Amino acid sequence: IDLNFNNACNLRCKYCFTNSPKGDHVKEYLDYKAIARLADEADELGYFEFDLQGGELLLQPNKLFKVLEAIKPERFYMYLTTNGYYLDDAMAKRLAEAKVSRVSVSIDSMDEKIHDEIRGRKDSWRRAMEGLKHVQKHGMDPYLNITVGHYNAHTDHLKQLLDYSKDQKYK
């Protein structure tokens, strides 16, 4: 099950339609009871994976943890996708305690300057890379989420990302 419950984001990625915390696309959220019913039905039907996506989920941690509580992650291989900007050690610990199994962190390049330029925010690369380490430290599966586009498809960046992921024993 893939659940996109938040379209707000703190970055301005050149390729992403979800590039603003303002606008009609961020006003409505599924209520927690609907999410709980969806998770219960998924569990009854034998689904074993649940993926939370956004926007940036860690931008609104209180909502994220209410959603996790509604889902009851212990029933699933629970994972979420983040740009990693707010994925500090304390957040990684909270996610692990909430029974999140895997955290996918979006990285566009092993070159910090290129990644930050694509993402539209200085320090986004450094914080994302640190976030991956925090995920691993707290026993969750770190995962590189790589978006491929014209800006990196014909460069060494993809190979560098894959080699790094393998060297770090990321999924």
List the predicted regions and their residue ranges:
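Short intrinsically disordered, low-complexity coil segments enriched in acidic
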Residues: 1-5, 27-30, 116, 163, ...
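Conserved alpha-helical substructure of the radical SAM core
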Residues: 1-102
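Glycine-centered loop/turn positions within well-structured domains
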Residues: 11, 112-113, 142
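Alpha-helix N-cap and loop-to-helix initiation/capping positions
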Residues: 26-30, 119-124, 153-156
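Generic structural signal for individual residues within well-ordered alpha-helical segments
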Residues: 36, 65, 93, 116, ...
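Conserved C-terminal portion of the radical SAM core fold
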Residues: 45-53, 74-79, 101-104, 126-171
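Conserved radical SAM core fold
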Residues: 57-59, 84-89, 104-122, 148-152
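Glycine-rich, phosphate-binding/catalytic loops in enzymes
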Residues: 68-70, 96-98, 120-124, 160-163
